[in-house]
Amino acid sequence: MADADDSLALRAAWLHFVAGMTQSAVAKRLGLPSVKAHRLIAKAVADGAVKVTIDGDITECIDLENRLADLYGLDYCEVAPDIGEEGLPLMALGHAGANFMRREIEHGDHEVIGIGHGRTLSAAVGYMPRVMANDLRFVSLLGGLTRNFAANPHDVMHRIAEKTGMPAYVMPVPFFANTAEDREVLLAQRGVTTVFDMGCRAELKIVGIGTVDAQAQLVTSGMIELGEVEEIANLGGVGEMLGHFFNANGQWLETALTGRTIAASVENADMSRIVALAGGLSKVDAIRAVLKSGRLYGLITDERTAKALIGQPNGK
């Protein structure tokens, strides 16, 4: 967008959010079609020019956070209020994840922050405002070449670099190599090794959690075949994190994909903090499996999912 349009977007946003004018009134004031005014206001929001702050705590969510932390041994837990979304609660989780990332970036405690994959993390980066950062690098925690652009981590890393002004690195290799031998060849390349090691050493890893079924994003994005995920399900696989699979008891599973996966370790031996951003009733079993693995430092989820995770039927 040209500078003139940037200025116009800010003016439209100011009239709408500060002056309290309707979008049609903004359009009339600026001499624009209503559709144009709407797009300018939306652009200002997407660019992080509009920041909303709500003071105060939601008692019910805090109670859920404490109960989840106690039940699963979490050091950090955040529950976003239910806003009535159907299916995957992308708006609630996206805003909660965006606020978490903004706080972590502003605190300046990290040299490297690792970013996983998935629609929820993409939404969080999308909702995150522009943030001032210093001496910070972002790195993708998994191979970034996919056949489906919508699932491509490159876009997420580009946006987070744009919003922080800090460098963001992706691994220029597939998430899953064709063979274990191919994986070794790819990881032996100097540029790939550097980014892979950076991801493994990231002090903070923000990840998504996936299911092990036909609706899993790994399947719908074309990263793996349906038959492969069915094979993992037959082994007892329930949840997935960074291409690592877990059964209902939280035990890590060695699968046919294990030797082909190009992603950072999820072991906590390096003392990194792994924080998962995940929710939705369809993912409850997957999230519970990963929680039981003991590998998570923290969880950011939504209210209905939190209730289901502590045993309240249907998240009610």
UniProtKB/Swiss-Prot annotation:
Induction entry: Induced by erythritol and negatively autoregulated.
Signal peptide region: none
Free-text function comment from the UniProt entry: Represses the expression of the eryABCD operon, which is involved in erythritol catabolism.
Superkingdom, taxonomy of origin: Bacteria
Record's protein name: Erythritol catabolism regulatory protein EryD
Keyword tags: DNA-binding, Repressor, Transcription, Transcription regulation
GO MF annotations, alphabetized: carbohydrate binding; DNA binding
Location of the DNA-binding region in this protein: 23-42
Taxonomic lineage of the native organism: Bacteria, Pseudomonadati, Pseudomonadota, Alphaproteobacteria, Hyphomicrobiales
A Pfam family reported for this protein in Swiss-Prot or TrEMBL: Sugar-bind
Activity control mechanisms: Erythritol may act as an inducer, probably by binding to EryD and inhibiting its repressor activity.
Disruption phenotype: Mutant shows increased transcription from the ery promoter.
Keyword Aminoacyl-tRNA synthetase: no
InterPro entries named in the record: NagB/RpiA_transferase-like, SorC_transcr_regulators, Sugar-bd_dom_put, WH-like_DNA-bd_sf
Disulfide partners: none
Entry similarity comment: Belongs to the SorC transcriptional regulatory family.
